[in-house]
Structures are given as structure tokens and as C-alpha cells.
Amino acid sequence: MTAPSSGVPGGGDGRQPLTGRQLLLLAFAAAVVTANAYYIHPIIALVAKDFGVSPSEIGLVPALNQIALAAGIFLLLPLGDRFSNRQLATLFAAGQLMGLVVMAFATSFWVFVAASTFLGFSTITPYLLPAYASKRVEPHQLGKATATLTTGVIAGILVARVGAGWVGEHLGWRWVYYSAAAVMLLVTLLLPRIMEGRDKSEASPPPGNYPSLVLSVFPIVRQHPEVLLSGAIQGLGFGIFLAVWLGLGLHLTSPEMGYGADTVGYLAAISLLNLATTPALGAWADRTGPRRARVIISLMQFTAVILLGFLGHSLWLLIMPLVLLNLVGPLIDITGRMTFLTLPAGVRTRLMTAYIVLMFIGGGLASWAATWVYEHEGWHGTAMLAAGLSALLVALSFIALRFDPARRNKA
């Protein structure tokens, strides 16, 4: 098993490093397959009204989607260390396509929930791509490559939320999923052309059958316990993101505020800033070190979350803390991944499994909590929930400094 620090181009598997064009194509694929989970954000009130359900009931849609994603990643993502990422990514993309089609035509709320849950279970492709790319870039370019893929994810989230808001308001929420299914069909056909199969010179897959492969996550995590801390931090960060934006989807379309779903979508255009800033901030994290960078951005995030509660009465004032949240949010994920993607290539996918499972458990719980709290306490309750999550994230970020190699060397 060859460590990425061996100096062999592409992480030591004998392949040439990814070209800029190939990395951009991977980022595009990540954008499309990631977008599917975020269409619900601006149209959540429209879907709830159409099916005649309460905020806490509609909150089950994103919550179960995220929990199913965590289950799918735990059960399916470890296969990336054994089978071709190309084959797996294409198969799971086809699963997403099936889920989108059922959601588009569902006439029962619970059928819609079930299809959304299956969609989440199938959303594995964007989490295969970072480990795939990390084997094909030079170690000193890992932050930049991870940031490029994260930028693709951000672009997908942006298009999903802005586009879904406009389409849902003017054409109806079902057209959001008709369109998503059409684009997903295209990506399912294109993925085999974007990715390469497993190379003969690549490290041998881990021994054992499927159950032993899945369970092998646990001893690997015990060997690298920091991944649990990074995963918990990212779970909190992702939970804050979902709590804020699902709460906004209900708050801004409420009688008190009186805006439409398209306004919620337009507000999500703030994420455009990330397309320009995330690669540069990823390079900054390379220079600063992921753990120290994470402490800084966690404090900035806490400041932004506190402002949300005070400024919730005004759409225009909300823009200020939302801009700050969008600037720093992706860096929590990037710095978290950087703490373990420099480890040997043969264990990265399973470490990514633990990391992403924790991320989506946090996101799923926060999704339901945010809609439940909104139903009972309104926007200020949602903001207080986000503030509590952010305070815990700051504390864990400081604790994670004990894993910083620079500190260990001084000790």
C-alpha cells in the first residue's frame, strides 16, 4: 500500500495526475449529483401545501434523505476500495435517477418521502470522487483539488436552490423534479466517459467478503481517531447549513414575511461568492494548516449565526450574516477532509465513509429539529438552535488542535 507522500505522480498508483480539464469534469459531475438533495430547500413550503402537511411533517423529507444518505454511505461507499469507482458512480447515479422520477410523479406524500429517502440512499457518487481524485493529484495540490471538487458541489447546490425556487414558483414544484431527472439521465450516461476504471498497478483491494469490508471501517477509524472528530465537526457545520436554509424556506414564505419560493431561491444566489472564494480559501488552508484554519472559520461562523437571530425580521439585513456563513461553511468541510486525505490511498475511502456518515447524521437530525422548532418557536427558535450547534462546533475545533503535527513536534 503506497502512501501519497511517496512522490509518485497521481498518488502512487502508476497513473498520470489529473489534468485541469478532467478535474473540472469531475467537479461538474459532483455538482449535478449533489444538487438532487437541495431542490427541496426553496420549495419546501410549496410541497407541504400541495400535500397538506405541517412543517414538522415536511421536515421528514430532508431529514430521512440525509439519514438514508448516511446509511448508504456506510453500506456502499466502502466498496470504493474494492471495485472500480467508475462502475459504482454510474450505478448509483442511475439509482438517483429512479428516485427523482418517482418524486416527480408522486401523488401521495409518503410515496414522495419514500422516493426522497431512496434518492438519499443512492447519493454516493459525490463522495467517491474526492478519494478517486486524491489518488491522482500530487500531495501538495490536494487542498486545491479538494477545493475544486467542493466548488462543483457548491455550484450544484446553488443551481438547485436558485433554479428550484424560480421553477417552483412559476411552473410548479413538480417541474423541478422533471428537470432534475432529465439532467440526471445525461450525467448517468456521461460518467463512464469521465472516470477511468481500476488500474492494474493500483494497490490491491482489501481482503475479505462484503460484510468484512464494511466492518473494516471500524478498525481503520480506531487507527485514525481524528476522523471521528472531523466528522462530528462537519456534521455540526452541515446541520447549521440545513437548519438555517430550511428555516428560511418556511420563514420567508410565511404570512409574516410574505415572500415567494423564488425569493428564497434568489437569496441562495449568495453562494455564487463561493465559486470564486472557495479555491482561494482552500489554498489558504494548505498554507495555514487545516486545524488552525478551521478554528478561525468556526469563530467567523459563530458570529454570523448569532446575527441571524437579531436580523431575521428583514430580508435585506439577513443578507449580511448569510454572506459570511456561505463564505466560511465550505471551508469547514475542506479542512476536515484535509486531515485524513493525506493518509494511505487504500484507507481513504473507508475514512471518508466514517466522515460522511457523521456529516449526514448531523444534517438529518438538524433538518428535522429545525422544522420542528420552527413550527413551535418560529424563526428565532431556529436561530437559537443554529447558535447552539455553532458553539459546539467552535469547542470541538479547538479540541482538534491537539492533533496538529506542528504542536506534536513542539511537544
PLM regions: where:
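Juxtamembrane intracellular "pre-TM" segments in multi-pass secondary transporters
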Residues: 8-17, 196-231
